[in-house]
UniProtKB/Swiss-Prot annotation:
One of its GO terms (molecular function) is protein serine/threonine kinase activity. It comes from Aspergillus fumigatus (strain CBS 144.89 / FGSC A1163 / CEA10). The active site is at D190. Signal peptide: none annotated. ATP binds at L67, G68, F69, G70, A71, N72, S73, T74, V75, K90. PROSITE patterns: PROTEIN_KINASE_ATP, PROTEIN_KINASE_DOM. It is an enzyme of class 2 (transferase). Gene3D superfamilies: Phosphorylase Kinase, domain 1, Transferase(Phosphotransferase) domain 1. It comes from the Eukaryota. This is Serine/threonine protein kinase AFUB_078980. Its EC number is 2.7.11.1. One of its GO terms (cellular component) is cytoplasm. Induction: Expression is regulated by the hypoxia responsive morphology factor A (hrmA).
Length: 393
């Protein structure tokens, strides 16, 4: 061992002791009102690990506050007592099934690549299992991220990304998609912004519901400080629905972002993500969804969604429909729409409200390269990265 390494080991910081959590003077919420993960349609309290603020996992990760939740997990802001840094800890519900997200993240960790898009994909630090009252739970440790693009957008006035920021985000997203296909879009930041969350629980304890077996906390998401403008590259994250391989079957994607081939029961490839990018642009830039897809009762309807696609994109190509197992529910053998739903009077161009002239024309050409009925006609991520509108200053 060199003298330098002996010296660095001598000066290495010892692990920090766990902090004593707040045990009083926090807001108690009405036990009859459902909050957070309780509001998920298939919520089962017994499936979630009963995390408490102050808990320490693996003898090193102390829980400081709750960041968020989903149908299958909760996410916690933690202090790494060994390496004196902040991390995000995702704790999954109890399940006997192999966790798809863990599989994908392990695969990512094993990939050796110099592709620039790999740095734009969120990687896990480590994964482990813990045992709860009703079984085992898988856990993933990540670097914490500041916020999602959509939450960042909500802080803007008006609530739409400026064109230059949209272009930058799309370039990074497409570069990451060229390396790996995913859905969630988040903004990354350095460690300094997290320091005030370290002590925020002491200054303003999280509201919570408490009973003898389980405490449910209100999330404390990160927010930009007033006047703070420092943020890093957007990262792709959340691989819970990611797939390994090239061709798949089955239903995927949230209703309003679902690609035509998925709706019509066809096999699908990475081109479903290109469709997602095209649809997501409206959320980020136009401040509204491109498609609605709801019937008169407010519930999702594939027929209404397909009718909107016809209005926005034009008629579906006959050669595409002939490959779609479920197309005869909505079209006749000649490709004429026979759905009971009338095609609405709207267009893709009319739904874009901010651009004008040649710039709008170029933007619409860019979008139409992604929003194509036939996935084989959608451009790939590398092709889209050279689009004239995207690279124009």
């Amino acid at each position: 061992m060199t003298p330098f390494h002996r010296l660095s080991r001598f000066f290495r910081q010892a692990p920090s002791p766990p902090r004593t959590p707040i045990t009083s003077n926090f807001p108690i919420l009405d036990s009859a009102v459902k909050i957070e993960e309780e509001r998920m349609p298939a919520f089962d309290r017994g499936l979630f690990y009963p995390v408490k603020l102050g808990d320490v996992f693996r003898s090193r990760y102390q829980v400081l506050s709750k960041l968020g939740f989903g149908a299958n997990s909760t996410v916690w802001f933690c202090r790494d007592l060994h390496q004196h840094r902040y991390i995000a800890l995702k704790i999954y519900i109890r399940s006997s099934e192999v966790n798809r997200e863990v599989q994908v993240l392990k695969h990512l960790s094993s990939v050796k690549t110099n592709h620039p898009g790999s740095s734009l994909v969120r990687k896990m630090i480590e994964e482990f299992e813990i045992t709860g009252p009703s079984g085992s739970h898988q856990c993933i440790v990540y670097e914490p991220l500041l916020t999602s693009l959509l939450h960042f957008q909500a802080t803007l006035k008006p609530q739409s990304l400026p064109e230059d920021l949209l272009k930058g985000a799309l370039q990074q997203l497409l570069l990451a998609l060229d390396y790996l296909h995913s859905e969630a879009h988040v903004i990354h930041t350095d460690d300094s912004i997290f320091r005030e969350w370290d002590t925020s629980e002491e200054a303003e304890p999280s509201p919570r519901k408490v009973d003898s077996s389980h405490t449910i906390y209100k999330s404390r998401p990160f927010h930009r400080k007033k006047g703070w403008s420092g943020f890093g590259m957007p990262l792709l994250s959340d691989f819970g629905e990611a797939r390994l391989g090239d061709v798949h079957d089955g239903s995927i994607q949230p209703d309003i972002y679902r690609a035509p081939e998925v709706i019509l029961g066809m096999s699908w490839t990475s081109k479903v993500d290109i469709w997602n990018v095209g649809a997501l642009i409206w959320d980020l830039f136009e401040d509204h969804h491109l498609f609605d897809g709801r019937g008169p009762n407010g519930d999702h309807s594939d027929a209404h969604l397909l009718a909107e696609m016809i209005a926005m994109l034009g008629p579906a190509p006959l050669n595409f429909l002939r490959k779609a197992p479920q197309s005869r529910k909505y079209w006749d053998s000649n490709g004429r729409w026979k759905g009971a739903i009338e095609v609405p009077q709207c267009s893709l161009e009319d739904s874009e409200e901010y651009l004008e002239g040649e710039n709008k024309k170029m933007f619409m050409q860019f979008v139409r390269k992604m929003l194509r009925w036939d996935p084989e006609e959608r451009q790939s991520a590398p092709e889209l990265l050279t689009d004239p509108w995207l690279i124009a200053q």
